[in-house]
Amino acid sequence: MYAIIRDRGMQYRVEPGQVLTIDLLKAEPGSQIELGEVLLVGNGEQVKIGSPLVEGAVVRAEVLGEKKGEKIVVFRYRNKTRYRRRTGHRQRYTQIRISEIVA
């Protein structure tokens, strides 16, 4: 069984047991969360497509922890003026494990 979920503007294809990295959630590691915006549910031969969401469908997941992405360097430069600015950014993510899909 698989589902396509929407979480804060991003869509993910998920299956039970899958480890997924999403944008940062305010949740403690080890806690259970529900992702309620399910757009599609399928199990091989049968597919339910929502308009826009599948009624009564919920994806439950366990929060594994937080991690940071790779460092992105932003460099601003203006020629002939000795103007240089270098900053870095590391996006924070939450890792979750999909425990079940209820449709």
UniProtKB/Swiss-Prot annotation:
InterPro entries: bL21-like, bL21-like_sf, Ribosomal_bL21, Ribosomal_bL21_CS. The keyword RNA-binding applies. One of its GO terms (biological process) is translation. PROSITE patterns: RIBOSOMAL_L21 (PS01169). Keywords: Ribonucleoprotein, Ribosomal protein, RNA-binding, rRNA-binding. Part of the 50S ribosomal subunit. Contacts protein L20. This is Large ribosomal subunit protein bL21. It comes from Chloroflexus aggregans (strain MD-66 / DSM 9485).
